[in-house]
Design a protein with these regions (language model features):
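Basic- and hydrophobic-enriched, low-structure N-terminal and domain-boundary segments
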Residues: 1-111, 115-123, 128, 166, ...
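Conserved ATP-driven motor cores of ASCE-family P-loop NTPases powering translocation/secretion/packaging/pilus
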Residues: 401-502
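Short, surface-exposed polybasic-aromatic patches that bind anionic ligands, especially phosphate groups
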Residues: 516
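Short, exposed beta-strand "edge-strand" segments with a Pro/Gly-rich flavor and a Y/T-containing core
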Residues: 29-63, 89-90, 241-254, 314, ...
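Short intrinsically disordered, low-complexity coil segments enriched in acidic
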Residues: 2-6, 454-458, 508
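P-loop NTPase motor domains
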Residues: 75-90, 94-409, 424-427, 491-512, ...
Length: 583
């Protein structure tokens, strides 16, 4: 009896062992048993996301408390860019990159660039005392944050509203040319001021011509280059000889139009006669040399190109912003807490070039201020360039990304795809800009775009396990190999939820960053900031007659040249559409 029970138990044990072996064997030789886990020693790549310890060593963790900040309490001492956050209940901790960096944010439409990224960063800028400039296509940033910055944080706020210029603060494009020309006229030995005036005149002319015609001119490049020189020349003449109230960009257009008329001397127009009154070494004469020495037809083409480029300024509303004093002062912007909001009209991209021009002028003036402070600003300055890919080409943007970082100027470019940058700056220019952006923040990928593929490639590959299973009648087998796999495939990137971004930083592992809606950060808005409509102001324009008198008074009449009788007179009746001059 005992022997039978023992035999039964032995049979049961053997059966269980056989069953376990069968199950184990079936799992081992199933494709589901081959897991794509990280293996090996990085033979096909070592990409991985940063761990919690690495994130804490890379970024500053700052308690985000806007309610206390707005009461002047617990203000953050670390200046930098907010790239992520951690939440425990209602407690929000911001991850701040405090290094001298530039950043490029790549996110499609509807990714939450404003509500998830810009609002927290503007709040942090205000609390940390950083001056900032931001472009704003919807007007939301100025509407919601200009009042907070001014009334709560004590910022000097300027709003350049290109959508509604009659409510905008002033922005005379010739302001810096006038400033340095006045300095030179007061001290004729100050050649540095004269050189700066000429430099800013060239920047204005190039930006104006490029914005209206693009960068590819082909066989017509002579006419556009000559038009740039002519506009530069007239800008310098306006700055040097015209009354202060007429020194603006619209006067440049009017003078070119006036100087097209015949001079009374066969074969020469008013422009040629006017420039001949200048000394041979005067730079205004040199800049216009390509235009005034050309044949009659070529010169007419150059003049028409110059006037066509300036047509964007012929707007009665826009004149109220362009023809009076400028509120923005670069030195004050760097030394005191200041905020500049540039509101762009979504329905009219022809005015976008003014942002490009403002960025160039501000950048160069910031370099001058930084040089006076030992090479670097004492207070960090931030440029948030939303829709950078939609703005006309910013000349020397590659140089800005290369050099501005060490001056404590951080540029945060926001684009919808890399293709936008490549369109404006070419393949090499785009590569230089991206190589000099120490932080890349990517998310909100379009299902049909190729940006996700580019970001996936940038993240690199990791080494994972793969294999195969073969089954015979009696001897199933399994083989395992190592292969490279993208850290995140394009499909995985495209399926990321709203508010989740990839943050890649130079010299660090990439990070999966979660940015919350501004309400979750504890951000609330006060009453919308509204600029009052200015009373219509009379615009005064420079006149060629007065300009000629000033030149003759300054330099006299050149030997062998006479003022042709009647040359100083103008028709009593102007042609329809011409601007009445103020003399």
């Amino acid at each position: 009896m005992l022997g039978q029970e023992t035999a039964v138990l032995l049979l049961l044990c053997v059966g269980l062992l056989l069953l376990m072996a069968a199950v184990t064997n079936g799992a081992g030789f199933s494709l589901d048993g081959i897991k794509g886990r990280t293996v090996g020693d990085g033979q096909h790549g070592t990409a991985r996301f940063a761990g919690k310890g690495e994130i804490r060593r890379t970024f500053h963790r700052v308690r985000f408390r806007p309610r206390a900040w707005r009461r002047g309490k617990h203000l953050p001492k670390v200046q930098g860019l907010v790239v992520g956050c951690e939440m425990r209940g209602k407690r929000v901790t911001a991850l701040v990159d405090s290094d001298d960096i530039h950043a490029m944010m790549v996110a499609g439409s509807g990714a939450g660039k404003t509500a998830y990224f810009l609002y927290p960063n503007l709040e942090y800028c205000c609390a940390a005392g950083m001056s900032f400039l931001t472009s704003d296509t919807k007007g939301d940033l100025a509407r919601n944050y200009a009042g907070i910055a001014k009334d709560i944080y004590g910022y000097d706020v300027s709003v350049l509203d290109l959508r509604n210029p009659v409510c905008s603060d002033g922005n005379n494009l010739l302001d810096l040319v006038n400033k340095y020309m006045d300095a030179y006229m007061a001290h004729p030995d100050d050649l540095a001021s004269r050189a700066r005036a000429e430099k800013y005149a060239k920047i204005i002319a190039k930006t104006v011509v490029t914005s209206s015609s693009g960068t590819e001119h082909g066989q017509n490049s002579y006419f556009y280059d000559a038009a740039e020189g002519l506009i530069t020349s007239v800008i310098l003449l306006v700055a040097e000889f015209c009354p202060p109230e007429t020194r603006h960009i619209v006067s440049v257009f009017k003078l070119i139009q006036d100087l097209l008329s015949p001079s009374g001397q066969k074969g020469k127009n008013q422009l040629q006669m006017l420039l001949s009154l200048l000394p041979p070494e005067h730079k205004a004469r040199w800049f216009a040399g390509a235009a005034i020495t050309a044949g009659e037809q070529a010169m007419a083409s150059v003049l028409s190109t110059a006037m066509a480029s300036l047509n964007a300024f012929l707007d009665s509303e826009l004149e109220q912003m362009l023809c009076f004093s400028t509120k923005i002062d670069a030195e004050k912007f760097c030394r005191e807490k200041s905020a500049v909001f540039v509101v762009l009209p979504e329905e009219d991209s022809s005015k976008y070039f003014m942002v490009s021009l403002l960025v160039q002028q501000m950048y160069r003036e910031i370099l001058v201020v930084a040089d006076g402070q030992g090479g670097a600003l004492k207070n960090r300055v931030m440029f948030f360039l939303d829709e950078l890919g939609s703005l006309p080409k910013i000349e020397s943007l590659e140089l800005m990304f290369s050099a501005a970082r060490s001056r404590r100027l951080s540029i945060v470019g926001i684009i919808q795809s890399y293709g936008q940058l490549e369109r404006n700056y070419g393949k090499e220019g785009c590569s230089i800009i991206l190589d000099n952006a120490q932080d890349t923040i990517a998310g909100g990928f379009s299902p049909a775009g190729d940006t996700a593929e580019q970001v996936s490639r940038q993240l690199g590959e990791q080494t994972v396990m793969t294999g195969s299973v073969s089954r015979g009648k009696s001897d199933p087998s399994r083989s395992l190999q190592m292969m490279g796999r993208r850290l995140m495939t394009p499909d995985e990137l495209k399926s990321m939820p709203k508010g989740q971004f990839i943050v890649m930083k130079t010299g660090r592992r990439p990070m999966l960053s979660k940015l919350r809606l501004f309400l979750d950060w504890g951000i609330t808005f006060a009453e919308p900031y509204v600029l009052e409509q200015h009373a219509q102001r009379e615009v005064k324009y420079a006149g060629s007659k007065e300009l000629r008198r000033k030149i003759v008074k300054e330099y006299g009449i050149p030997p062998g040249q006479q003022i042709v009788p009647g040359q100083e007179r103008f028709p009593e009746r102007q042609k329809p559409g011409m601007i009445q001059e103020n003399v």
